[in-house]
């Protein structure tokens, strides 16, 4: 039995939702990636209720597309939600992990930002951990470029060892 995972992500620009189906057997294996665009009218903070519904619905649609032949092997979905507001002391995310879990019948892990803030972090715990994992392979040179509007980390070679 394979252990597969779905990772979802939407940027602060609120233009689309990206998803990947991956496994970590013998390193990172990206099995499939897909993108769904958001509606044009739901890109402002005033539309929070609509944003929450749309990110939930689009997440369900995207997960179902990613896992159509592998659903029985998917262990979990990582769903950070759509950032509505974020600073060092709090983060507000739109989207319903409970509905995504119920509709896809796959466990959903979410609210990473507030968990990180509660532990004294800046609310962006996943990317630095993923970069550390990705960059730990010493055989090849790698470069990571973060183009997000929320600064996550500036890893040094020493901090990754």
Predicted regions, residues:
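Short, Lys/Arg-enriched, disordered terminal segments
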Residues: 1-3
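Short glycine-rich, Thr/Ser-proximal phosphate-binding strand/loop in the N-terminal lobe
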Residues: 5-49
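Short glycine-aspartate micro-motif
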Residues: 5-9, 74-78, 142-146
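Glycine/serine-rich anion-binding loops at beta->alpha junctions
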Residues: 8-15, 82, 93, 146
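Short beta-strand-loop/turn "lid" adjacent to the catalytic site in phosphate-handling enzymes
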Residues: 47-97
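Secondary-structure boundary elements
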Residues: 68-69, 106-107, 136-143, 147
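Active-site neighborhood for divalent-cation/phosphate handling
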Residues: 78, 82-138
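Single conserved hydrophobic/aromatic residue that forms the stacking wall/gate
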Residues: 151-161
């Amino acid at each position: 039995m394979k252990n597969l995972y779905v990772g979802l992500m939407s940027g602060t620009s609120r233009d689309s939702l990206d998803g990947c189906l991956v496994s970590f057997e013998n390193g990172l294996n990206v099995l499939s990636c897909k993108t769904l665009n958001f509606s044009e009218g739901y890109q402002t903070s005033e539309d929070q209720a609509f944003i929450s519904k749309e990110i939930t619905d689009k997440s369900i649609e995207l997960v179902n597309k990613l896992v159509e032949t592998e659903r029985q092997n998917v262990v979990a979905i990582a769903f950070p939600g759509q950032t509505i507001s974020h600073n060092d002391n709090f983060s507000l995310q739109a989207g319903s992990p409970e509905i995504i879990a119920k509709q896809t019948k796959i466990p959903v892990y979410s609210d990473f930002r507030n968990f990180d803030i509660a532990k004294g972090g800046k609310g962006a715990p996943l990317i630095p951990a993923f970069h550390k994992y990705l960059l730990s392979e010493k055989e090849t040179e790698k470069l990571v470029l973060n183009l997000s509007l929320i600064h996550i980390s500036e890893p040094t070679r020493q901090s990754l060892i």
